[in-house]
């Protein structure tokens, strides 16, 4: 009987071949594909053991085996990364650009990964760790203005205030409010902006007659920040085989409106910043947290259970290797 390490190696090869071909894997196919110096009988015995342990399943129409959910999970967690020279070259080009914020850079990188590897990616930022760095007023006319806010990660938010229905409020009042917010709210964490703004009531009341109307407008609109997902290559998952329409609709809604990280209960013990989930609904999720300065970036890959786990993990690892050196504090 093979040692566990050898058996694990055989299991990885079986699943790798199945992911590539989509067909049940036989002992002869495995030996031929990977030029294994073992007999078919030995491979069949190993396959039988792996089936008994719940990593493989036998189909009714073939003598070959296919991965079980446990098998896919094992492959996703233990398969080794590989170098994609084209992707590495493209990311190097993107990250060499100066003066781009981390969000703009991440956007370009995610697009490159989608185009080169063909994965469905989701990126998001945890705004709870960001702070307000700038707030500016741009007047559009006598009754409306755009408020521009810039966060510590370079994220820019444009919020419009319309005073058409508030005849007792003038743009001069908004100017005064902006000046006070600049003095009191810069370097405040985004999650605390609304609370801190409310605490300015006594000061605002000294300078603005109808300060409560302005304050509620800022709290309800301008100072409202949410974690926003950006989805790349949505068509890739739509085209994948084996995902029924109901589950596809559910997963598309989830990835657009929820944290993939929080959706995954399981965790790879060796790396507390990486989570992998292989589901019975033929959906697989890989999510990585990358900590840069005072913010958290979430990079996730979504696909069917036959997704290219090796390329997905390799792309995430490569992306992290570029992000941290460029955007760490010592390099800013």
UniProtKB/Swiss-Prot annotation:
Under Gene Ontology molecular function, one entry of this record is: DNA binding
Record key words, sorted: Repressor, Stress response, Transcription, Transcription regulation
Gene Ontology biological-process entries = negative regulation of DNA-templated transcription
Q: Which Gene3D superfamilies match?
A: 3.30.450.40, Heat-inducible transcription repressor hrca homolog, domain 3, Winged helix-like DNA-binding domain superfamily/Winged helix DNA-binding domain
Q: Which family does it belong to?
A: Belongs to the HrcA family.
Q: Its function?
A: Negative regulator of class I heat shock genes (grpE-dnaK-dnaJ and groELS operons). Prevents heat-shock induction of these operons.
Name of the protein in question:
Heat-inducible transcription repressor HrcA
Q: What is the lineage of its organism?
A: Bacteria, Bacillati, Mycoplasmatota, Mycoplasmoidales, Metamycoplasmataceae
């Amino acid at each position: 009987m093979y040692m566990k390490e050898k058996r694990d190696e055989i299991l990885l090869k079986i699943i790798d071949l199945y992911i590539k071909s989509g067909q049940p894997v036989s002992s002869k196919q495995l030996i031929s594909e990977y030029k294994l110096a073992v007999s078919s009988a030995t491979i069949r015995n190993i396959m039988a053991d792996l089936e008994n342990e719940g990593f493989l399943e036998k189909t009714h129409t073939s003598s070959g085996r296919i991965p079980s959910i446990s098998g896919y999970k094992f492959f996703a967690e233990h398969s080794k990364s590989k170098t994609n020279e084209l992707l590495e070259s493209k990311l190097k080009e993107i990250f060499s650009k100066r003066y781009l914020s981390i969000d703009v850079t991440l956007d370009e990188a995610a697009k490159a990964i989608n185009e080169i590897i063909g994965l469905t990616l989701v990126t998001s930022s945890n705004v709870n760790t960001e702070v307000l760095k700038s707030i500016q007023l741009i007047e559009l006319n006598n009754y409306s203005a755009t408020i521009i806010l810039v966060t510590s990660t370079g994220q820019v938010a444009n919020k419009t205030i319309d005073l058409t229905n508030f005849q007792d409020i003038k743009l001069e009042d908004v100017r005064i409010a902006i000046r006070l917010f600049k003095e009191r709210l810069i370097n405040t964490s985004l999650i605390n902006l609304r609370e801190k703004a409310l605490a300015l009531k006594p000061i605002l009341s000294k300078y603005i007659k109808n300060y409560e109307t302005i304050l509620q407008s800022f709290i309800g609109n301008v100072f409202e920040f949410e974690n926003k997902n950006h989805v790349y290559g949505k068509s890739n998952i739509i085209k994948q085989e084996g995902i029924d329409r109901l589950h596809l609709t559910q997963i598309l809604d989830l990835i657009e409106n929820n944290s993939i990280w929080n959706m995954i209960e399981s965790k790879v013990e060796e790396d507390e910043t990486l989570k992998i989930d292989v589901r019975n609904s033929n959906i697989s999720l890989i999510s990585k947290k990358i900590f840069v300065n005072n913010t958290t970036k979430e990079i996730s890959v979504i696909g069917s259970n036959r997704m290219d786990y090796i390329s997905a993990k390799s792309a995430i690892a490569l992306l992290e290797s570029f992000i941290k050196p460029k955007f760490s504090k010592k390099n800013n």
